[in-house]
Amino acid sequence: MSRSAWKPPFCHPSILKSVNNALNKGFVNMAIKVHSRASVILPNCLGLKFAVYNGKDYIPVNVNDQNMIGHKFGEFSPTRKFTGHSGDKKATRR
């Protein structure tokens, strides 16, 4: 089920505080560290840099595009590494 229409989009209070500080003090080039992958990217985040935690590392995310607004931070930092499928054993054997 999706979120109720009467509720506002969820964004962790620490992210809102960091975004407001970055905009007010002019720290636009510094990356804001984000642990809350469930937080929604809001319109006031446009033009800022974020570092989203995937459980191991911080993945850099630049919010440059208008289409990123409304998506969640976790969508842009994958938690699993795809190593690829194994090759065909018959093709390598002679």
From Swiss-Prot:
One of its GO terms (biological process) is translation. One of its GO terms (cellular component) is small ribosomal subunit. It holds the Pfam family Ribosomal_S19. Transmembrane segments: none annotated. Keywords: Ribonucleoprotein, Ribosomal protein, RNA-binding, rRNA-binding. It comes from the Bacteria. GO terms for molecular function: rRNA binding; structural constituent of ribosome. Signal peptide: none annotated. InterPro entries: Ribosomal_uS19, Ribosomal_uS19_bac-type, Ribosomal_uS19_SF. The keyword Nucleotidyltransferase does not apply. Protein S19 forms a complex with S13 that binds strongly to the 16S ribosomal RNA. Belongs to the universal ribosomal protein uS19 family. This is Small ribosomal subunit protein uS19.
